[in-house]
């Protein structure tokens, strides 16, 4: 990659180009373009991992995710106050910018500075102790309302999804379940069971009609916890189910649509092993044992599944 001066020149040239689009087209070699984009992504990932990693006096670490309108980093320790925001951590974990050690550190810091079970779990940010309008409208709200320190359901669920993707299953479950518990605690949340946009400083659910969290919650349940998802057109089953989520018989079941078909799926955990200890030992497709390679997950080619509208899948864990 080019040095800093060359990068700045490239940015300047591109900024000028957008004002003078000629309409001419050129052919670009796709492999060259892919390589170029990957190199840029790797460079930015390395930069963020080192330059934007902040710590407190005890070594707890997380990413600075924002700069204010004066070009100053927002997060870290300022005037004896910790400034941490959940959003930057979510996308760092989900986008594989945070390595495994950094992800573990982020979880620890989020539990220390952002988590409050009584109000639904992970708040969007710590209390900055100032009206910082050079960062945005969030400081127009009292701490604990909306974007300023509320438990924002959408970001909490995305945090859980990111943790599941990275294999931090118990931690992802904690984020999801605390949110659910708060919503179901009607005397405090003062709402019907469901997911609100956010929980305020008193744990009250606000704006249940204004959130994308429900769809993210369901997607996380289906594709990560149940592990039922498509991959390049084929069917993947990779369960991330904790022991407490299985029923008394050690089963966990549901029905899903996939590519115009319906699947009745049951996971069986007869030895009642915890996540991390079990593997897929048997797969039964429509009553016949499937001989594909198994471990913590399995991929079934869609060619094997074509020709029927309804399927049954029984996956034995051991």
Whereabouts are the PLM-identified features?
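Non-catalytic C-terminal accessory modules of carbohydrate-active enzymes
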Residues: 112-117, 129, 140-148, 158-318
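Alpha-helix capping and helix-loop boundary segments enriched in small/acidic/polar residues
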Residues: 28-39, 76-83, 143-151, 163, ...
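A general alpha-helix detector
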Residues: 88-89, 155-159
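Structural helix-adjacent loops and short alpha-helical linkers that scaffold large soluble proteins
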Residues: 13-42, 52, 96-108, 163-174, ...
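Extended glycan-interaction surfaces of carbohydrate-active proteins
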Residues: 17, 42-151, 177-180, 184-199
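Single conserved hydrophobic/aromatic residue that forms the stacking wall/gate
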Residues: 1-13
């Amino acid at each position: 990659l080019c040095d800093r001066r060359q990068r700045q020149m490239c940015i300047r040239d591109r900024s000028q180009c957008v004002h003078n689009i000629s309409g001419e087209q050129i052919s670009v070699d796709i492999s060259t373009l892919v390589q170029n984009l990957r190199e840029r992504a790797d460079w930015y990932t390395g930069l963020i991992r080192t330059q934007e990693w902040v710590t407190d006096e005890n070594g707890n670490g997380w990413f600075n995710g924002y700069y204010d309108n004066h070009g100053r980093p927002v997060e870290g320790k300022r005037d004896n106050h910790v400034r941490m925001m959940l959003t930057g951590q979510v996308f760092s974990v989900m986008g594989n910018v945070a390595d495994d050690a950094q992800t573990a550190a982020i979880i620890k810091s989020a539990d220390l500075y952002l988590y409050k079970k009584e109000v639904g779990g992970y708040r969007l940010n710590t209390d900055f102790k100032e009206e910082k309008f050079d960062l945005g409208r969030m400081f127009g709200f009292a701490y604990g309302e909306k974007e300023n320190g509320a438990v924002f359901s959408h970001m909490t669920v995305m945090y859980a999804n990111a943790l599941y993707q990275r294999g931090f299953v118990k931690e992802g479950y904690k984020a999801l379940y605390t949110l659910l518990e708060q919503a179901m605690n009607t005397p405090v949340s003062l709402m019907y069971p469901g997911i609100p946009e956010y929980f305020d400083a008193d744990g009250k659910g606000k704006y249940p009609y204004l959130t994308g969290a429900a769809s993210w919650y369901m997607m996380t349940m289906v594709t990560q916890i149940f592990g039922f998802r498509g991959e390049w057109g084929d069917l993947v089953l990779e369960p991330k189910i904790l022991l407490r989520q299985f029923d008394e018989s050690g089963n966990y079941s549901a029905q899903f649509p996939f590519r115009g078909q319906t699947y009745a799926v049951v996971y069986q955990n007869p030895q009642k092993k915890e996540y991390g200890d079990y593997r897929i030992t048997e797969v039964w497709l429509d009553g016949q044992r499937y001989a594909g390679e198994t471990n913590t997950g399995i991929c079934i080619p869609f060619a094997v599944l074509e020709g029927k509208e309804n399927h049954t899948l029984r996956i034995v864990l051991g």
